[in-house]
Amino acid sequence: MATTILIVAAEAFPLAKTGGLGDAITGMARALIQRGVPATILLPAYRGVAKQLDSAHEVARLEDLPGGDARLLAGVCPTSELPFLLLENDALYDRAGLYVDEDGQEHPDNGLRYAALSHAAMRIARGLPGLPRPDVVHAHDWHAALAPMLIREAGIDDVKSVLTIHNLAFQGQFPLEDAAAFGIPPACRGEHATVAWNKLNFMKAGIGYADRVTTVSHTYAREILTPDFGCGLDGLLRERAPDLMGIPNGIDTVLWDPSRDRHLGSLQYHSGDLANKRLCKTVLQREFGLLQDPNATLVVMGSRLTEQKMADVAAEALPRVLEAYPDMQVAILGQGDRRLEGALKALAVQYPQRCATRIGYNEAGAHRLHAGGDILLHGSRFEPFGLTPLYAMRYGTVPIGSRVGGMADTIEDPGADTPLTAMAFANGLLFDGDHVDAMANALSRAMHLRKHPMLWRAMQRNAMSTDFSWQRAVGAYEELLASLVSREDAAQEQGEALSQRHGQARAQAQGKAIDAATPAAEPARNRRTRQARGSMMPV
């Protein structure tokens, strides 16, 4: 019988997305379903989201959740063809912005909003009329990280929990006095459970209570065990190390495919013929107001403009390389720290028709950026996985990335000290640290490689042919989920056998005949529950 999964998250493309989390949730769910694993996504009913589902309808009412009563809606997203459960409470979710308002300020009740989401997951795990129970609740990031604790404290022993850490830097920290409003049991309001640095910490609760903890790359799984990358939770993570594993993300290779990308219109292309990629560069140059020069090397950046993403380093490194290579251009798409936005926008004044920065993000623009670029610059002080370099590689845009987290796992670079011919086996370039010199040297190295067309073409082919699909990635999740359920089944069978032996012994002592094939009543009830959970969540 297939293991049924309830995926609990704050984002899922295309219904709600601010970054890579939304892409990862959708890609994972689709791949699991394609492999025969029933999976449903539980998501807040943000403004306008319910209208995007086909035949959205109420399946349950949830009373006394944090933030008030809510409805549970079910439906299918027509574009992704994925089943969703939406937690509807307009007082919590019907507003502009997922996490921040129109002025970029965090919603002051974010703790309440996502505590409600975790409580809804626990209620589903416990059982709601007409709604099959999942075998595993898979919580993602701090927004859903209370769910494992709530499931454990509710005594729901036959539903297992997994927490996936997409970014440990965001932990969901809130005042201690909010614990009651968040529905955190009194027994869990201490340093042993949910409190760190005199604040409630949702991520700490998830790490401590989940049956398994995963993160999104092998390198990041090792990094977060250290003080440099553990964001203060490395001690707890080291305690949970036997239950911690890195499972690399995948990408949606249908959505990110230059041969059928609707955002490219008639300029779609494939690895065997890159003629249209050159035309995509012309389109991008025109869009950003750059000189339309087919021989220019166009470096693109598409990310949050923050210190984590080394936007501060890029603002200093790019002018050095622009001065050294007059044929280099830069196109930047992103938003973030206003100071860093200004520093990058200033490059357009210093280098007119060679540099341009567009503040904001839109999906179509991101696709055109990867299609039109020659090189992706993606520095990062820490990077749990790094989806953007993989998108770039799909489009034959060679990435330059920091040697951290997932990029250390996915970008293959023999190194600057190897013979030039060794780069024929590379799919990108890596640099170490967050120094301006390191980034500038990596850019210079890429500009030098561009002068060797056959070598560069080999790197493009390598990048475009590397398999980063969710079908490759999801097998490890499937094995993990199945092992949790099989372990529960084994424990249940052992309990049934023990109960049966005890029953037989008691009957024999009383001189009664016992049919050895008849199990005790309590295990039988457990078996019926298991059978009832064998199908997909209703939609």
Report each predicted region and the residues it spans.
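Catalytic cores of nucleotide-sugar-dependent glycosyltransferases that transfer UDP/GDP/TDP-activated
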Residues: 1-505, 512-539
